[in-house]
Curated annotation (Swiss-Prot):
Protein name per its UniProtKB record: Monodehydroascorbate reductase 4, cytosolic
Gene that encodes the chain: MDAR4
Coiled-coil stretches: none
Keyword Oxidoreductase assigned: yes
Catalytic function, reaction form: 2 monodehydro-L-ascorbate radical + NADH + H(+) = 2 L-ascorbate + NAD(+)
Location of the protein in the cell: Cytoplasm
Tissue distribution of the protein: Expressed in anthers.
Organism: Oryza sativa subsp. japonica
Top-level EC class: oxidoreductase
Binding site for NAD(+): 172-178, 196, 202, 261, 314-315, 349
Listed GO MF terms: monodehydroascorbate reductase (NADH) activity; oxidoreductase activity, acting on NAD(P)H
Length: 435
């Protein structure tokens, strides 16, 4: 076996967080040969949200190298050449199958070994597949998932092969809503199926969801709620032809896209680090219970200062910010200095069709819907406040300008008191503007 390759710093994972961590290391003056990124993917880190949005456009679709990190936040695009110039080693198409934190050694599926002084775990999440639950027929062709660029390429190929066909989207969350819009824009006949009483149940109230379901229905998307896919039919070639639902219905399908959630990829570290909330427990600097080992983005269960509790956040904004925080903390520690604790304000957003919403804060407590949430409105603009213990703790806004979105973020952070809920409903966005 070849000798282990040693690096001062290793980032394990090649997603959004890896790209932002590499940029921060470069800013902090990392020396050539000190840093490596080890990734299962075959390309340099890229902005993952593009896969469910621009990548699927019928015209002028986004393609690499156009959306390598860090363009998603208005930063420099880090092409593979950038890593070479900085002396950062990109070790791609490499799957790590064993991590021994005691000996600071990583082993790949090809039996290559890598050692490090400091490790950043940025392994992200894997998609939950219907085959994991033994759903009958779930291994048929053109039952697709979306997590990485390889998945996106399979989806694009299927869309071209099954042009103007029937698409069934299983799941009513982020991926379900964004991909239903993408497939409809590509002239597919689209049906969404999900078990919950409304879409995006982890964030949306029934009032918010009613707008999006109405809007999608007006676009010709069929929505079937309160049931799940229990089986699939395929033709002699193994291509999917139908989706069988628990309620007895059978839907014709040329393509099925499944978006039923993800699981943080922490299995390599089981029994070696403290865990919480399904992730790897860290402090406010993203250091784990093992000194010199950090966990960022999807896998980190970190102290959310604003709400005084440990949380895990699966979102690109947190992936970027946690990566930067961890690298700053690593370099500060080496210099005998300190950095402020991570103080994250939860943020989610989505764009589909002509719609664009943003949410900041916490969606707990009483919700107060404001504005016009008529799905037939030419330019819909509405939102919701969440009130807990007499204070605004979360704000959602559809159709906001950049300035208005900044205002709602400020409100979610400031948590102003609310004396009169009815007055708040009438004031709507004006309340936020006064904070």
């Amino acid at each position: 076996m070849a000798a282990a390759k040693h690096f001062t710093y290793v980032i394990l994972g090649g997603g959004v967080a890896a790209g932002y961590a590499a940029r921060e290391f470069a800013k902090q003056g990392v020396k050539p040969g000190e840093l490596a990124i080890i990734s299962k993917e075959s390309v340099a880190p890229y902005e993952r949200p593009a896969l469910s949005k621009g990548y699927l456009f019928p015209q002028n679709a986004a393609r690499l190298p156009g959306f390598h990190t860090c363009v998603g936040s208005g930063g420099e695009r880090l092409l593979p050449e950038w890593y070479s110039e900085k002396g950062i080693e990109l070790i791609l198409s490499t799957e790590i199958v064993k991590a021994d934190l005691a000996s600071k050694t990583l082993t790949s599926s090809a039996d290559a070994t890598f050692t490090y002084d400091t490790l950043l775990i940025a392994t992200g999440s894997s998609v939950i597949k219907l085959t994991d639950f033994g759903v009958q027929g779930a291994e048929a062709n053109d039952i697709l998932y979306l997590r990485d660029i390889e998945d996106a390429d399979k989806l694009v190929a299927a869309m071209q092969a099954k042009k103007d066909g029937k698409a069934v989207i299983v799941g009513g969350g982020y991926i379900g809503l964004e991909l239903s819009a993408a497939l409809k824009t590509n002239n597919f006949d689209v049906t969404m199926v999900y078990p919950e009483p409304w879409c995006m149940p982890r964030l949306f109230t029934s009032g918010l969801a009613a707008f999006y379901e109405g809007y999608y229905a007006n676009k010709g998307i069929h929505i079937i709620k309160g049931t799940v896919a229990v089986g699939f039919d395929a033709d002699a070639n193994g291509d999917v032809t139908a989706v069988k639902l628990k309620n007895g219905n059978v839907l014709e399908a040329d393509i099925v896209i499944v978006g039923v959630g993800g699981r943080p990829l922490t299995h390599l570290f089981k029994g070696q680090v403290a865990e919480e909330k399904g992730g790897i427990k860290t402090d406010a600097f993203f250091e784990t219970s093992v000194p010199g080992v950090y966990a960022i983005a999807d896998v980190a269960a970190f102290p959310m200062k604003l709400y005084n509790e440990i949380r895990r956040v699966e979102h690109v904004d947190h992936a970027r910010k946690s990566a930067e925080q961890a690298v700053k903390a690593i370099k500060a520690k080496e210099a005998g200095e300190s950095v402020p604790e991570y103080d994250y304000l939860p943020y989610f957003y989505s764009r589909s069709f002509d719609l664009s919403w943003q949410f900041y804060g916490d969606n707990v407590g009483e919700d107060v819907l404001f504005g016009d949430n008529d799905p037939t409105a030419a330019k819909p603009k509405f939102g919701s406040y969440w009130i807990k213990d007499g204070k605004v703790v979360g704000v959602f806004l559809e159709g906001g300008s950049a300035e208005e979105n900044q205002v709602i973020a400020k409100v979610a952070r400031a948590q102003p008191p609310v004396a009169d809920v009815e007055a708040l409903k009438k004031e709507g966005l004006d309340f936020a503007a006064k904070v």
